[in-house]
């Protein structure tokens, strides 16, 4: 029997969707705990061959004598690299992540870009304050036509971004750590490809940068003051990757002093911010909210969370595991950290 332990109690619609997805699989049982607490999970952990969840505690991993596969339903696994490296020193456990939210993340990236270019937030705020039709003097839209869109990372999200933006009169370039020789679907439009060591030529070539790369030791601080300067005074930046990929102070100063024209940000630098004297919480250390050329988003690119199709990759991996297949989806390379 293959027990699949979920690390939280899913709502009824998701339970039904998952159960229907694995119906008929040989010797597989989905185990839904009564609560997400360690107290509720520990008694169930010993018999689990598969776990599905985001943040297993050290005690929980230590209790899993039969664990062979851990499925992280989201893309980000930086918090799991160290514990799974340690676990794999004792016995092999496969870690996979999920890209079921890639469509929504790409949709959000495009929405952020258009909100930034069309100055939607500024004009909304002026109208909400009763300031009617102030014109373009302070907040003219930025045409996309003729721009060079740079996709930093060309995985699940940015490939979808490319499809979404393909109807605009723009050029596309992408930088990827390793370009496959063949076998991957063709891009929807012409794409100039840059290799991992060509970051600076890539940034010199583009003027609109959309980041969707994992956070690893190699990508933390990848975009700093020098890189932002290469993007140029007309440059726009959209980050749906991780905050740590872009140097926070460097980004703030580049926006404040006009090194780049604007940024739209969904990922941040302090995910447990303390409230100020007015009870406000800001997930960053520099006052981005005071800048007129920024669109702020509270790490919600993966919404809507109620979309059940996002779990199809999890179901597919459970099927492959149940049949003893080795070609699991999205296996994480612990050495490369993604």
Task: Indicate residue ranges for each PLM-predicted region.
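Rossmann-like adenosine-cofactor binding region
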Residues: 178-284
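Glycine-rich NAD(P)-binding loop of Rossmann-like domains
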Residues: 124-160
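Short, conserved loop/helix-junction motifs that constitute active-site signature segments
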Residues: 60-66, 83-90, 228-233, 254-259, ...
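N-terminal glycine-/charge-rich "phosphate-binding" loop or analogous flexible N-terminal tail
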Residues: 1-48, 173
């Amino acid at each position: 029997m293959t027990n699949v332990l979920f690390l939280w109690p899913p709502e009824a619609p998701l339970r039904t969707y998952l159960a229907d997805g694995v119906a008929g699989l040989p010797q597989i049982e989905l185990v839904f705990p009564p609560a997400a607490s360690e107290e509720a999970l520990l008694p169930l952990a010993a018999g689990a061959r598969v776990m599905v969840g985001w943040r297993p505690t050290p005690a929980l991993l230590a209790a899993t004598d039969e664990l062979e596969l851990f499925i992280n339903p989201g893309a980000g696994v930086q918090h799991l690299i160290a514990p799974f490296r340690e676990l794999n020193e004792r016995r092999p456990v496969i870690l996979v992540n999920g890209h079921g939210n890639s469509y929504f993340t790409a949709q959000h990236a495009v929405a952020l870009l258009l909100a930034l270019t069309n100055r939607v937030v500024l004009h909304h705020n002026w109208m909400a304050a009763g300031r009617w039709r102030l014109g373009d003097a302070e907040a003219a839209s930025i045409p996309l036509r003729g721009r060079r869109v740079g996709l930093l990372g060309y995985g699940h999200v940015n490939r979808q971004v490319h499809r979404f933006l393909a109807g605009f009169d723009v050029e596309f370039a992408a930088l990827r750590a390793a370009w496959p020789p063949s076998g991957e679907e063709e891009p929807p439009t012409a794409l100039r490809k840059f290799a991992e060591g060509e970051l600076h030529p890539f940034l010199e070539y583009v003027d609109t940068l959309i980041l969707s790369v994992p956070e690893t030791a190699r990508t933390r601080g990848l975009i700093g003051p020098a890189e932002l300067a290469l993007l140029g005074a007309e440059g726009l930046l959209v980050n749906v990757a991780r905050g740590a990929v872009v140097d926070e102070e460097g980004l703030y100063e580049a926006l404040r002093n006009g090194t780049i024209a604007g940024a739209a940000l969904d990922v941040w630098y302090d995910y447990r911010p303390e409230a100020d004297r007015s009870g406000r919480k800001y997930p960053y250390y520099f006052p981005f909210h005071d800048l007129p050329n920024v669109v702020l988003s509270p790490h919600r690119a993966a919404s809507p969370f109620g979309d059940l199709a996002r779990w199809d990759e999890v179901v597919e991996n459970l099927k492959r595991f149940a049949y003893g297949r080795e070609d699991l989806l999205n296996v994480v390379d612990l050495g490369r950290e993604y």
